Amino acid sequence: MKDRKKDRKREYRVFTIADWEREQDYLRKRHGEGWKFTGLTYPGVYHFVRCQPEDVVYQLDYNEEGIKHKDEYVRMFQDCGWEYIQDYAGYSYFRKPV
């Protein structure tokens, strides 16, 4: 039986609102190391699953209007090749292969 704990991990990180670009870089680096971001929970716990290392860019987007019109907002990103992951602290998290 496969050890599922080895295929999942959590990391604690703190990024401020001003650090959104550093956060994107952190998620991209982890994906390149074979850890795909699956979600963020309070307080700053990042969840990952093992994956094939791949160059994937992450986008954190803060848009109050997007939150008000969620379906159209997410569809706009999906039409441009982005995968929606989640919302957290006002930001929407997206990713796509480079």
Q: Residue locations for each model-derived region?
A:
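Terminus-proximal functional modules
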Residues: 1-98
